[in-house]
Curated annotation (Swiss-Prot):
Catalytic activity: L-arginine + ATP = N(omega)-phospho-L-arginine + ADP + H(+)
Gene Ontology biological process terms from the UniProt entry: phosphocreatine biosynthetic process
UniProt: ATP binding residues: 59-63, 68, 150-154, 175-180
GO molecular function (one): ATP binding
Keyword Endoplasmic reticulum belongs to the record: no
Classification via InterPro entries: ATP-guanido_PTrfase (IPR000749), ATP-guanido_PTrfase_AS (IPR022415), ATP-guanido_PTrfase_cat (IPR022414), Gln_synth/guanido_kin_cat_dom (IPR014746)
Protein name in UniProt: Arginine kinase
Family: Belongs to the ATP:guanido phosphotransferase family.
Enzyme Commission number: 2.7.3.3
Amino acid sequence: MADAATISKLEEGFKKLQGATDCKDVFDQLKQTDKHPNKDFGDVNQFVNVDPDGKFVISTRVRLIDDHFLFKEGDRFLQAANACRYWPSGRGIFHNDKKIISMQMGGDLGQVYRRLVSAVNEIEKRVPFSHHDRLGFLTFCPTNLGTTVRASVHIKLPKXEKLEEVAGKYSLQVRGTRGEHTEAEGGVYDISNKRRMGLTEFQAVKEMQDGILELIKIEKEMQ
């Protein structure tokens, strides 16, 4: 469980977001009694190699907690979490080598996911993660509250004309080749699950898998 001070800061930031006019449509749907689902990695065998022929997916990665080691002033989510107070004074980073990331070349999402689940379960036997019944797993960046899971692929889709349409249908986030705020180079995109909160870890990764399979299907039809 998280300590009281951490919860207090999160609640304070949450109230600021509730009062933001550009967030009204989202927060009107939220209830104080809502709870984030319990951790559930589901049936790991339901995840497959999304690109067995190796024609589209360059690499696959599933990780807990987006890196966010450095950030710029002005992000409304970070401001709401009080991460930009006294800017630019007091900036510092404590960064160790404990990253929980499972990554490999190719599209074998099943193998990547199973390895991550195994690692997380072993780590939790010794070091419990901070968790809140309503907010899920707690991280510094409020956009990652909930499962904190980001499952992504680097995928080549030079002909995909329905990329944004499919991304919206499957709650996918489309980034450029080198991540957020970059362009796609040679038709290569970084595509990941968008939703973190209000669903299980299994559901988050399953959304990504279903969306990627649909994108590959459309790309093949265009060839």
